[in-house]
């Protein structure tokens, strides 16, 4: 997805910013990038296409505020992770004062599917108010932890039972939504789906 986005805007470098709190993720991504290089899918004149593209993996020490795009850019540049005044916007003057597109991994993960199947097909996925798909991370509290992509509107119980293969230990509640998420008691799980409507 990042390579396709880079091609669309004429970029030759994609920066993968991964927080240091996730060392295993950093290593997995570095191995994936090395594998792409070994297969000739990144670098100069990729597969004789005339297209150049490289990935730079950054193990970031940034604080939570670095989730904001301009604070993230400051962190990558080795500066304090503080929000920048706008304008200029990153697309005008971003990383090292060059035009920069900033997206999260979930957005970029959708790009290949959208390119292959079309935006209209992607918009038909999900519910009326929550289109597309979502990435769901299941931790070691599940029998089969991992990251899964599900269509918006998928019942939360189905995610737990079919993808996570149930809980690995007795569970009273789930923490959903990352640092700014909430605690959901097990009695509410069957009323929820992976969408914006049921979580309001």
Regions found by a protein language model. Name each.
Residues 1-5, 152-168:
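Short amphipathic, charge-patterned alpha-helical segments
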Residues 1-25, 96, 103, 109, ...:
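Internal alpha/beta scaffold segment
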Residues 75-87, 187-200:
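Active-site loop ensemble at the mouth of alpha/beta enzyme cores that anchors a bound cofactor
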Residues 26-152, 164-166:
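Hydrophobic alpha-helical positions that pack around
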Residues 80, 156, 182:
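Glycine-rich nucleotide phosphate-binding loop and flanking beta-alpha elements
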Residues 13-33, 55, 167-199:
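Terminal amphipathic helices with adjacent charged low-complexity linkers/tails
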């Amino acid at each position: 997805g990042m390579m396709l986005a880079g091609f669309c805007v004429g970029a030759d470098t994609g920066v993968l910013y991964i927080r240091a709190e996730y060392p295993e993720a950093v290593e997995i991504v570095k191995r994936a990038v090395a594998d792409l290089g070994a297969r000739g899918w990144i670098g100069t004149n990729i597969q004789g296409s005339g297209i150049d593209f490289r990935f730079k993996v950054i193990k970031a020490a940034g604080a939570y505020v670095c989730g904001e795009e301009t604070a993230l850019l400051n962190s990558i540049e080795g500066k304090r992770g503080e929000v920048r005044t706008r304008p200029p916007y990153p697309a005008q003057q971003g990383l090292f004062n060059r035009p920069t597109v900033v997206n999260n991994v979930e957005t970029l993960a959708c790009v290949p599917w959208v390119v292959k199947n079309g935006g209209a097909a992607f918009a038909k996925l999900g519910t009326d108010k929550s289109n597309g798909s979502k990435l769901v991370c299941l931790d070691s509290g599940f029998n089969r932890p991992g990251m899964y992509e599900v269509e918006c509107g998928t019942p939360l119980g189905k995610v737990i039972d079919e993808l996570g293969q149930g809980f690995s230990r007795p569970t009273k509640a789930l923490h959903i939504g990352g640092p700014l998420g909430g605690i959901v008691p097990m009695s509410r799980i069957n009323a929820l789906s992976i969408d914006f409507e049921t979580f309001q």
